[in-house]
Amino acid sequence: MALKSSSADGKTRSSVQIFIVFSLCCFFYILGAWQRSGFGKGDSIALEMTNSGADCNIVPSLNFETHHAGESSLVGASEAAKVKAFEPCDGRYTDYTPCQDQRRAMTFPRDSMIYRERHCAPENEKLHCLIPAPKGYVTPFSWPKSRDYVPYANAPYKALTVEKAIQNWIQYEGDVFRFPGGGTQFPQGADKYIDQLASVIPMENGTVRTALDTGCGVASWGAYLWSRNVRAMSFAPRDSHEAQVQFALERGVPAVIGVLGTIKLPYPTRAFDMAHCSRCLIPWGANDGMYLMEVDRVLRPGGYWILSGPPINWKVNYKAWQRPKEDLQEEQRKIEEAAKLLCWEKKYEHGEIAIWQKRVNDEACRSRQDDPRANFCKTDDTDDVWYKKMEACITPYPETSSSDEVAGGELQAFPDRLNAVPPRISSGSISGVTVDAYEDDNRQWKKHVKAYKRINSLLDTGRYRNIMDMNAGFGGFAAALESQKLWVMNVVPTIAEKNRLGVVYERGLIGIYHDWCEAFSTYPRTYDLIHANHLFSLYKNKCNADDILLEMDRILRPEGAVIIRDDVDTLIKVKRIIAGMRWDAKLVDHEDGPLVPEKVLIAVKQYWVTNSTSTH
């Protein structure tokens, strides 16, 4: 009897256990179904997007190909009724540059090129309309053809073909401009000129990767450096040489509107492996050598400065230059004196070319500590340059412990430096940023870019040549995209919590500081693709999102693409604004799934031109 009782108890316990397991399975099944239905806390974000009309599918209806004509808007009638439609600006604004407006510039002093510096329109003068493309506008040629040919309709200015006719800058042929690769200092072409420089400067082994071209003209120097895997940041003012920077960008060469005047250059300290001036008309010896001191600030230890043209070899050329030899002699004396004060070593002088090299550290420059002319900059942050006045002072080298140590850290040759840990990271120069955090950021951007390519298969095919990252961070987006087919302008906002542009340059990438509450220093329609990572969250309560989006529209080419990554609530607001901007747009889930609150907004700008009342 006892045995039978024990057996019955065991069966009862087994039945209870089975019931408990079954009940738990049912509970979790019901819980999962409840969450998936849209009423669970975990999917409240997805529900919000559904209720707001957001579409998180993989943008099957967006067309990234170029057709020179846009498609009808994707915004439904009910949604369109709620959005503000931005009207086209008048046709006279096709090449409007808000912070380098010619009429406004003429109200400022001409001393030290102040009138050519950035002078942005006050709030009551801002244009709240869409900048039109000129009639006949077409998508630029693909690289490398774009290096040599630009459609006339895109930049219809023939002034340079007359002014620079004998210098072989640019020629007008039928419906295109042709760029023969010549220049004032390139009588045998830019390639031959660069060959001469390369006999002194190591351009072929990745040691020299980033370059600065001051007063770049149409940027032929930067264009022909491309095949040597050197990336030049070129700048020139918006002046009587109409559209020179616009031509550079139409050719697919990195360039911005800029000038050496009274304000520091918008680049970090120790950014460039070499700097270049070919008849750039900058008075290098003036203001106690202040302009050379600014070049020294942005030049890496061991970097090179090239001066081509007056006053080099003035004894032979003063008659051809139609300048008094006494003036040229004095100009060169001041340059040599400033270079000596900076402790640069003259490496080469032949014909009209001279090359100096900056020392790798200040071990050989101790004697200048006692020179009364050597005024050292007192600032603790040499990268704090936005709208800061230039000073006639020498930027100190970072400290070193031996005579052969490179101040600030030695960089690997490119392409190894692209993914190596930059010295600014490994040395702990950026507070709160560790090597692990940097490497994790790289992994994340490789993952993000892989997802972008699934959405837009044309991303790395050459369809998009000029790309901008509006909030670049460490340059992870650009590094993941790195290719001979494209380049990325890495913009670090001046209000960013951490200044990472120095890291961008240490990776062998290029970029610039900018405040997106103002217009960028470029012409309209100069970028094929714009990427904005958490930019609108960053500028929340700082300035109007409408103004930022209108600026994006100004600098984006017709049929260009936009990728905006941000929190979903921010993107819903952005999507509502761009519904009135002649963009086609879709919201896409994060690559890790719909429950991630970060989403991606993909957009394509429609094709339309001046005097058009609707898209073609």
UniProtKB/Swiss-Prot annotation:
It is found in: Golgi apparatus membrane. SUPFAM superfamilies: S-adenosyl-L-methionine-dependent methyltransferases (SSF53335). GO terms for molecular function: methyltransferase activity. Glycans are attached at residues 205, 611. The chain crosses the membrane at residues 14-34. GO terms for biological process: methylation. Residues 35-616 are lumenal. It is an enzyme of class 2 (transferase). Residues 1-13 are cytoplasmic. GO terms for cellular component: endosome; Golgi apparatus; Golgi medial cisterna; Golgi membrane; nucleus; trans-Golgi network. Its EC number is 2.1.1.-. It holds the Pfam family Methyltransf_29. Keywords: Glycoprotein, Golgi apparatus, Membrane, Methyltransferase, Signal-anchor, Transferase, Transmembrane, Transmembrane helix. It is a single-pass type II membrane protein. InterPro entries: Put_SAM_MeTrfase (IPR004159), SAM-dependent_MTases_sf (IPR029063). Belongs to the methyltransferase superfamily. Co-expressed with the galacturonosyltransferases GAUT1 and GAUT9. This is Probable methyltransferase PMT2. It comes from Arabidopsis thaliana.
